[in-house]
Amino acid sequence: MAKNTAIGIDLGTTYSCVGVFQHGKVEIIANDQGNRTTPSYVAFTDTERLIGDAAKNQVALNPQNTVFDAKRLIGRKFGDAVVQSDMKHWPFQVVNDGDKPKVQVNYKGESRSFFPEEISSMVLTKMKEIAEAYLGHPVTNAVITVPAYFNDSQRQATKDAGVIAGLNVLRIINEPTAAAIAYGLDRTGKGERNVLIFDLGGGTFDVSILTIDDGIFEVKATAGDTHLGGEDFDNRLVSHFVEEFKRKHKKDISQNKRAVRRLRTACERAKRTLSSSTQASLEIDSLFEGIDFYTSITRARFEELCSDLFRGTLEPVEKALRDAKMDKAQIHDLVLVGGSTRIPKVQKLLQDFFNGRDLNKSINPDEAVAYGAAVQAAILMGDKSENVQDLLLLDVAPLSLGLETAGGVMTALIKRNSTIPTKQTQTFTTYSDNQPGVLIQVYEGERAMTRDNNLLGRFELSGIPPAPRGVPQIEVTFDIDANGILNVTATDKSTGKANKITITNDKGRLSKEEIERMVQEAERYKAEDEVQRDRVAAKNALESYAFNMKSAVEDEGLKGKLSEADKKKVLDKCQEVISWLDSNTLADKEEFVHKREELERVCSPIISGLYQGAGAPGAGGFGAQAPPKGASGSGPTIEEVD
């Protein structure tokens, strides 16, 4: 496998890690300093550019020109609230370039600005070099991980960073998914297990629920916060000590970037110490205006400073359980990923939430993601080793996918959180007599009406042979592959004519915020949606009944059985209702129900003599404003044909 080795890179907010799968196992590769994780830092000086440990080590001397946290900027707009709030904490300068954030630094005596992708690509280049030094040959193929909540532009920008670093990015995979792969290889026991992965890193927090069964991984739900991690805990400590310095020495150090940076370094060290000891001391010589700052902090005080952040980690856990439709008792394993999960209070909160369940700490939390990425890279390169042979990875669709049926109703074929790859087929029919074609409009979203959802694409299937409404059978298939690319095909069963559209998830898809917003809106508007659904159902039921009555009395087979007077009475009333419908499409449910009862009072006595029952149910279909519905009036979906 020598030359076409593929590596797995965990590109973290604060630290990155690289692994390679060879000789049947994963090696996490140490850098030139002997560290298995490398700071995601890039520094620019008068003479050189430093990446990794070298950059982080000189940060106190050169804070304005040392860039970190590029992952917080990547794929975001300058005006983004997250970018604006983060800028307050950064010692380096972020400038606006056409609503794209750029980092401005002095390098070799001149001012330079870089896009976040460029900074991340420098970190990726460093990780690539670490792997090459270990393997002894060039490496180009890589799998790079991102938080589960990264939106499309953030994923695309991360991929771009890989390309800038000279990597062939085989795939971008979710960090929790990667951790699950690492975990899956460690656990080859049989039987289905539900695993909750709690990933609290330097900058992002992800909760994922996966089902692992005999080498098959299935992501059931993901939740999290793109802005919670170890750095936020450091910020709390920094603020605490800035206040303490003010109290003790009557001086404000917060505007002195170098002093704040030295304090932050000491705080990070103290935080790590507090994971194993109950007290940590800080000793910083000549922190500000020649004043030495010697102080200490207890674990209890640290927990108090961050208590809301720690407690807040349980909300995404609850949300993921809700989305996966699981009770906490159904989770078999709790897996900790990310350096911040070493904090005893975080472990205790999670353990208490799960009623004292043991936590799995068997995987080094800093390395699990890179480990899984390395395994995935080997799979994609076609590694034949038996350890990875039986491993299959399934992701989920973040939003429901469906099409518009008559009346603007959203009919979902693939439900939110369905496992991908997946394929769903449903049969639809026409809405009007001799309809020559149907327009297939593909939407994503959770709302009842398509106008509240996101249109992904549309196409037409024409050339349907003339036939009464409800007769043609049009089979629509939604097929999503492993990369999230959607193919929608429509086939007319009688002629075999087909048409299709391919929707890739490249550009302009919904961001995490929009997805969350749509789901929240869907919950908020559920009541409105119900009213609308009922209204459309009542309207469809009325229209269907009117058309059925009309066609029933016009049936040739009834000649002689039905007096002309009765026939005229029914037809006139039906025509009156149909005309009323045309001019009152926005009436409310009660009016439609009332009209239907009025029509039934005229028709039922006449028809019951001829038929037992009240006419055949109408067929549904695609169409203009109004879909017909079976006489049942049970809901807004179109009639499905078996």
Curated annotation (Swiss-Prot):
Residue positions binding ATP: 12-15, 71, 202-204, 268-275, 339-342
UniProt entry keywords in alphabetical sequence: Acetylation, ATP-binding, Chaperone, Cytoplasm, Cytoskeleton, Methylation, Nucleotide-binding, Phosphoprotein, Stress response
Keyword Chaperone in record: yes
UniProt note on tissues of expression: Testis-specific.
Family: Belongs to the heat shock protein 70 family.
Region (Substrate-binding domain (SBD)) location: 394-509
PROSITE patterns: HSP70_1, HSP70_2, HSP70_3
Its biological purpose: Molecular chaperone implicated in a wide variety of cellular processes, including protection of the proteome from stress, folding and transport of newly synthesized polypeptides, activation of proteolysis of misfolded proteins and the formation and dissociation of protein complexes. Plays a pivotal role in the protein quality control system, ensuring the correct folding of proteins, the re-folding of misfolded proteins and controlling the targeting of proteins for subsequent degradation. This is achieved through cycles of ATP binding, ATP hydrolysis and ADP release, mediated by co-chaperones.
Positions carrying N6,N6-dimethyllysine: K561
Phosphothreonine: modified positions: T637
Localization: Cytoplasm; Cytoplasm, Cytoskeleton, Microtubule organizing center, Centrosome
Taxonomy, superkingdom: Eukaryota
Residue positions, PTM Omega-N-methylarginine: R469
Residue ranges, annotated region (Nucleotide-binding domain (NBD)): 2-386
Domain remark from Swiss-Prot or TrEMBL: The N-terminal nucleotide binding domain (NBD) (also known as the ATPase domain) is responsible for binding and hydrolyzing ATP. The C-terminal substrate-binding domain (SBD) (also known as peptide-binding domain) binds to the client/substrate proteins. The two domains are allosterically coupled so that, when ATP is bound to the NBD, the SBD binds relatively weakly to clients. When ADP is bound in the NBD, a conformational change enhances the affinity of the SBD for client proteins.
GO CC term (a single one): cell body
Residue ranges of the region described as Disordered: 617-642
Pfam family of the protein (one): HSP70
A Gene Ontology molecular function term of the record: ATP binding
Name of the gene: Hspa1b
Protein name per its UniProtKB record: Heat shock 70 kDa protein 1B
Modification N6,N6,N6-trimethyllysine, positions: K561
Posttranslational mods: In response to cellular stress, acetylated at Lys-77 by NA110 and then gradually deacetylated by HDAC4 at later stages. Acetylation enhances its chaperone activity and also determines whether it will function as a chaperone for protein refolding or degradation by controlling its binding to co-chaperones HOPX and STUB1. The acetylated form and the non-acetylated form bind to HOPX and STUB1 respectively. Acetylation also protects cells against various types of cellular stress.
InterPro entries associated with the record: ATPase_NBD, Heat_shock_70_CS, HSP70_C_sf, HSP70_peptide-bd_sf, Hsp_70_fam
Keyword rRNA-binding attributed: no
N6-acetyllysine modified-residue sites: K77, K108, K246, K348
